[in-house]
Amino acid sequence: MSQSDIINSRQIQWFPGHMTKTLRLMEKEIRNVDCVLQILDARIPLSSLNPEIERITAGQPHLSALNKSDLADPEITKQWLAYFKSAGAGCIAMDSKQRGRATATKGLIEKELSALMERRRSRGMVGAAIRVMIVGIPNVGKSTFINSFAGTTRGKQWISVDSFDLMDMPGVLWKKFDSLETASNLAFIGSIRDDILDIEELACGLLSSVRGIYPQQLLARYKLDAEALTLPPYDLLQAIGAKRGMLISGGEVDTERTAKM
């Protein structure tokens, strides 16, 4: 059985009942909003793009926000912004912890919905709030983003901000991942529990990727010699554990503890 099959066979552990309820609620409420803003993780934009959310919200104007851009490579983020733009999708990069993000996001929404706002003005609906559904997978910073708006809470899910009504939806995943890469990426950022995968194998996969893209940063972070880059991934994990003093009796490296670091 492949790792992807193992992950999907354990879906009950990472797709609890409340996520099913969230998808049903989304299907019910989508007709009551003017726009959908999906929060993605700037480090893994495609892996954090939920196909179930895409399916449910397909009929509404759709915007994306690449959150946690402070943790991503800025040059790669520029490429992702260009990618979304080429696909005709409104998109911004942001750090939801940074002050002033709410203003930039509101500007994007207003730009995307300019035609709708003009129609409303022509009909005398000047005071009508724009209703925006905020969606995303767990742990992409959606709550921090919502809290960046100095708004007034109306009920359990609605927040009023200036000319906007924001509908905050709980983070939700989808039932089956199409690849091990997607599942691994989601585990890396904490969107699914990392114990669904073998933690040491997961860490080795991450080290292998980082070593290929950012070798010097890897060496600097763990104070390793250049020779470490030639090691097999598991040996590299052991070298990092040894540097950090993560040893067990007999002087062996505690690779499980190192992998969780």
Regions found by a protein language model. Name each.
Residues 131-154, 169:
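Glycine-rich phosphate-binding P-loop
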Residues 69-135:
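Canonical P-loop GTPase G-domain recognition
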Residues 38, 64-66, 134:
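Structural beta-sheet core signal
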Residues 1-35, 43-51, 56-62, 69, ...:
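Helix-rich effector regions associated with P-loop NTPase G domains
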Residues 109-120, 138, 149-153, 173, ...:
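Short, well-ordered alpha-helical segments in soluble proteins
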Residues 29-30, 85, 138:
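Intrinsically disordered, low-complexity regulatory regions enriched in Ser/Pro/Gly/Thr
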Residues 96, 143-146, 164-165:
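Conserved active-site beta-strand-loop modules that form the wall/rim of enzyme catalytic pockets
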